[in-house]
Amino acid sequence: MNKVSVGGVELLAVENQQTLVAYLLNNGVLLTGKLIAINAEKIMIYQEDNEMKRLLEEAEYKYADGISVVCTIRSKYPKYSKIERIAGADLWERLMAELGECCLPVFLVGSSEDTLQATAMKLQEWQVKVVGTQNGYFAKEQEEEIIQRIKASGAKFISVAMGSPKQEKFMQKAQQLYPDALYMGVGGTYDVFVGKVKRAPKCWQNLGLEWLFRILHQPTRWKRQLRLMKYAYFYLTKRL
């Protein structure tokens, strides 16, 4: 698949969610590697943090989650003017539904134990084959043991809800020890999936204002959004 570059980060030039899902499922043979959502904040961290830069460069599949990234691609690459934002939470749900139909085993990592179990139960109602779970509260010394559990489970898809950059670091290590699976970083997706966190209404999502909805409902996130201002400056000065 073709790629585009935004701020030095290479992303899949995929037009919409349906196309990306079909690409990852590869006619029933799930691709292996790391799947990471890219937004403006992550691109700015890529510019500032050498470790994050390395993690993102080594991730096989990166897609445009943030509307600002989508706007940059449309402006920078006229041939991709129809590219759409692919929300990570929506992509994950679609993949879960498809994996359930294909009977491919799934392992869930991250979040609190109660949210994790609620997620697993709901997925099982969707006929998803959940072969293991691990909450996000574990020490670095336990990582190898957890990864061996994942490997022993035979999981082909591992979703990791630990927030960035913890989930990227974990996926990197897990892939080194167990490369025969697709790893996806999903942040707070489990909380949204089971109804613990309210997601922006569809009209906000369609307008590309989901980030603003999050700030209004979680004011502690405002500092993270300062990077959006920096991104906007880079965009206006054509440094992306």
Task: Name what the model sees in each region.
Residues 1-86:
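N-terminal nucleotide/polyanion-binding subdomain common to many enzyme families
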Residues 40-43, 162-167, 189:
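Short glycine-rich anion-binding loops that position phosphate/pyrophosphate groups of nucleotides
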Residues 60, 106, 131, 156, ...:
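Conserved acidic residues
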Residues 70-71, 199-240:
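A transmembrane-helix-recognition feature enriched in membrane-embedded lipid enzymes
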Residues 70-149, 153:
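Conserved beta-alpha
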Residues 120, 168-177:
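Short Gly/Thr/Asp-enriched flexible loops that form oxyanion-binding sites at enzyme active sites
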Residues 135-141, 179-217:
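Short, flexible loop segments at boundaries between secondary-structure elements
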Residues 150, 154-159, 164:
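Proline-aspartate-enriched helix->loop->beta-strand connector
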